[in-house]
């Protein structure tokens, strides 16, 4: 049994920072709302947010990890405090609200990856409704770095079985 968390190898993103990478692939406003939620609900993470998300190049994708149950409980408390704070600030209460939130942000051109908001495929809208997963990858990176720093994490390779990107 491991005494330190185990996570997949962090990926160096194609942008200079985690925030810039998010802005290219998703709607930056969602990450900025999450930042507000973190500062409201977990203010002791604010400096590390700036260090690892605003200015850091490494992101732990896939939400994959193995850790002691006590650490898992602490992570889940942090994760859901932040995600629930995000949902409240974004005024997302239902799945319908989430879909409308994404559609609106696409229509007003808040996604850099979609050159023409009028030609975004329905599959891409559906994919972008995975905001909770996208944000939780950033939260996992933040929590892991805040609590364990890189040197205390056993990093293992992983295989991504399928990748489908919508442009």
What is each stretch, according to the model?
Residues 1-167:
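ER/Golgi luminal nucleotide-sugar-dependent glycosyltransferases, focusing on the catalytic module
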């Amino acid at each position: 049994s491991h005494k330190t968390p185990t996570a997949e190898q962090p990926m160096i993103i194609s942008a200079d920072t985690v925030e810039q990478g998010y802005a290219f692939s998703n709607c930056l406003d969602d990450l900025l709302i999450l930042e507000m939620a973190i500062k409201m609900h977990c203010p002791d993470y604010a400096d590390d947010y700036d260090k690892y998300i605003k200015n850091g190049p490494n992101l732990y994708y896939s939400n994959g990890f193995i850790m002691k149950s006590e650490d898992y409980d602490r992570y889940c408390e942090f994760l859901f405090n932040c995600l629930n704070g995000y949902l409240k600030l974004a005024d997302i209460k239902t799945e319908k609200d989430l879909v409308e939130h994404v559609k609106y942000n696409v229509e007003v051109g808040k996604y850099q990856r979609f050159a023409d908001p009028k030609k975004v495929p329905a599959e891409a809208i559906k994919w972008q409704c995975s905001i909770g997963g996208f944000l939780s990858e950033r939260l996992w990176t933040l929590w892991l770095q805040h609590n364990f720093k890189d040197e205390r994490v056993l990093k293992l390779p992983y295989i991504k079985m399928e990748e489908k990107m919508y442009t």
